[in-house]
Structures are given as C-alpha cells and as structure tokens.
C-alpha cells in the first residue's frame, strides 16, 4: 500500500512537471508567434 502511494506521488509529480514545462513552452511559442505576426502586420501597414 505504501509503495502504491509512493508511485502515485511520483507519477503526479512527474505529470505536474511535464504539464508546467509544456504550458510554459507553449505560452512562449504563442507569444513569439504573436509578436512576429504583429511585426508583420505593422510592417505591411507602413
């Protein structure tokens, strides 16, 4: 039983870390593409 609880803790910790990593990287990617498209639109207007 203790081992099961320990396994669950490790799995949830790993999932949390992976989720945080994916969230931060996707957020960074979204910001980068958003900035690029903004620059592109601003460049086209002038």
Curated annotation (Swiss-Prot):
Name the UniProt record assigns to this protein: Uncharacterized protein YNL067W-B
